[in-house]
């Protein structure tokens, strides 16, 4: 049999150090060149469809608009598939502070103005998700679980989230809740 079409999905969770933290021990400086190779290959071989797949969670919520813009500029022929993460609870976006949720929504709206309509139309569900998340605000129990999760993962990995995603402002060393 002859294969007429191949679809490849590249699952990433952010751009740069955000992806490195979530996908630890992944290293962006090796991921990006590989994505560029696939992008070139897909452009040269019309029987290959490539897409970027991403789940929005508390750890990449603030970075997603930036990542979206960079993905679109770096890989214009790639399709995008983005969905909000609902489980596990400790990674839900309502573990972020209200100001972080509002900042993420502001950033997303700014980025959507820069993208072509055929891209933004695919992101209507994500825009609604960001708006609803900002409207609902912080869940203190989820925030506590997020801080505990990151503290545990930092301890196990021997790293510190502040070196990867400093704007989350999660003080995992003393587990204080900053809401």
Sequence positions of predicted segments:
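Radical SAM/AdoMet-radical enzyme domain recognition
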Residues: 1-83
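Eukaryotic endosomal/vacuolar membrane-trafficking regulators centered on PX-domain-mediated PI3P pathways
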Residues: 34, 106-114
């Amino acid at each position: 049999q002859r294969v007429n079409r191949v679809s490849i999905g590249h699952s990433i969770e952010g751009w740069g150090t955000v992806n490195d933290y979530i996908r630890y021990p992944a290293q962006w400086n090796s991921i990006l060149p590989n994505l560029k190779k696939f992008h070139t290959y897909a452009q040269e071989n019309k029987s290959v469809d490539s897409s970027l797949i991403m789940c929005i969670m508390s750890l990449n919520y603030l970075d997603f608009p930036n990542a979206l813009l960079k993905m679109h500029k770096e890989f214009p022929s790639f399709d995008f598939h983005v969905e909000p993460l609902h489980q596990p609870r400790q990674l839900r976006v309502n573990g972020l502070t209200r100001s972080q949720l509002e900042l993420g929504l502001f950033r997303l709206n700014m980025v959507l103005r820069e993208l072509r309509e055929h891209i933004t139309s695919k992101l209507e569900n994500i825009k609604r998700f960001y708006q609803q998340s900002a409207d609902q605000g912080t869940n203190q129990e989820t925030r506590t679980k997020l801080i505990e999760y990151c503290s545990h993962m930092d301890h196990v990995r021997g790293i510190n989230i502040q070196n990867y995603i400093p704007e989350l402002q999660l003080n995992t060393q003393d587990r204080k809740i900053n809401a």
